[in-house]
Amino acid sequence: NWISEKAQLNLGFTYGDRFFNDRLGMLLSASYQNAPYGSYDTEFMWEQNEDGKVYVSDYQMRQYFVTRERQSYSAAFDFDINENHKLTFKGIFNNRNDWENRYRTNIKDLDENGKGTVRIQTKAGTPDNRNARLERQRTMDFALGGEHLWGAIGMDWNASYAKATEERPNERYLDFQLKKQEFDMDLSDERQPLATPGTGSTLTLSDKFSLKELTEQQEDIKEEDMKFSANFKASLNNGAKLKFGAKVVRKTKEKEIDFYEYTPKDEDAFM
């Protein structure tokens, strides 16, 4: 990636074979990806005053640095007990970590004369999370099944368990602002307007800025899914066939969000 200036790593492994005179089959698979990347973009909002003059009312510059790590592991087995009975098992586990740092400089509430408020914001996390905002998603799915034949009666069944979680620990936003700033607006390129600070104004964070807000959020989502099904079929003496079965499903989902906003007792010491 040309912004992160780091290479992407991709690894994969697959192995399969049969054992015990082909009665037991096995397939194993694993993959790993580490992708550091980033982006830079500018966003603008245009307005028109009563005199028909068009001007930029909101001016944003955003830079993102993200490291995405993906891990996936899976296994599948089938076992032929004998010609009338067979068991199968499948399992998969996925883990995705996103570490993100975002830096945003925003000129808000610009008027047609180029006067507005500068906001500088960072989105990050704690030292335990590489000082970045961590989003961790995990999924797992396991299924056990079988096929059986007892004379004229056949049966197949399947039991499965799936779980998905998402964690966003210590997601922090730090926002500073500086009011009454003046800018010279070059609108010759409508797709890329250029704001140049006037005399005494700035886009660079300094001790002139005041704290706008400091917030922290914890978010946890968990979803579980359990299923069991069984199907039977029987051949009757008159040549007819009887089929019946049952299925049970249980699903749960929980979401918990804790939000905190902090105000320093001594803002001068905090700055």
Residue ranges and their predicted role:
Residues 38-46, 87-114, 125, 156-158, ...:
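Outer-membrane beta-barrel and related beta-rich outer-membrane complex signature
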